[in-house]
């Protein structure tokens, strides 16, 4: 049977299942596709198809991720599910699968467990804007008081990590019953998808955000001036717009006097376009790879920040030994490497390969930076870690 093409008439949202191992994330993912397939909103996908997730590489890190897509009455969703806990950690820190929202799966029989906490904390650190809770395996709990207790625990945990625990929708159900086609099982899935539709906000389109373009290359064109090339990360750039060159050196102001793509002149470049931008009165040596062009005032250069980082294991091609305080690797932001020094928290002596950790970094040169910015840690040209800026310190 030929696959039907998804018509992109509905708004698109990226979502993922998170939660403790064996609480039913993959069963729930399968159940959503199977229930929505009945109304033509999905291709029914079996549990073992999702569980045998293919490996992908993101910034030199191998991650197993399963992707399914489905639609509700209101939206089109791309849904990621990871088989292992380490895959989740890597996925969230590298941003390999951008999440506009998450479904936190908690087993009603067990209540919140260590990875439940860790996934909520990570979601907060990496800026997942909203989540909905599916209290799974309720068919295994006979005592309604116990269900209420687990729900209270989950709400307290969400509040503790900065999510609005009191208002987050918690749907009770059983993914297994839904997979077996039982009406109460399917009903809970439909209720969950209604909650996801209404509670998880529609992401802001990249075009609407302020203009930002990381500089990849700089050329001088005789008689015309300096051209910088790169891929527009967000926003729109028009001929005549004032822009700032931010990072590595003092911020400079300039004006865009031309935008071209595939050697053709354009009126504007927008998020996703690979463009060349002609800068008025800027000399070739005043601009370099690693800086960004940005809407004036929208982003500032910083050299001190806190980060949540995943350190590659030896098997993944990372370091063979732990690192300690004052470790000085290269931090690769957008298009360039900058040396920085790592300061570990007082209670941490070292970070082992395969760990995730929170620490402070001090760069030798400032980089255009905002919270949520992703980076790689490199040593001698190979990736040894991946991180996300969680807080700017200066």
Curated annotation (Swiss-Prot):
Residues 10-204 form the tr-type G domain. Residues 81-84 are annotated as: G3. It holds the Pfam family GTP_EFTU_D2. Its main location: cytoplasm. Residues 136-139 are annotated as: G4. GO terms for molecular function: GTP binding; GTPase activity; guanosine tetraphosphate binding; translation elongation factor activity. It is found in: Cytoplasm. Residues 174-176 are annotated as: G5. GTP binds at residues 19-26, 81-85, 136-139. It is an enzyme of class 3 (hydrolase). GTP hydrolase that promotes the GTP-dependent binding of aminoacyl-tRNA to the A-site of ribosomes during protein biosynthesis. Belongs to the TRAFAC class translation factor GTPase superfamily. Classic translation factor GTPase family. EF-Tu/EF-1A subfamily. This is Elongation factor Tu. It comes from Rickettsia rhipicephali.
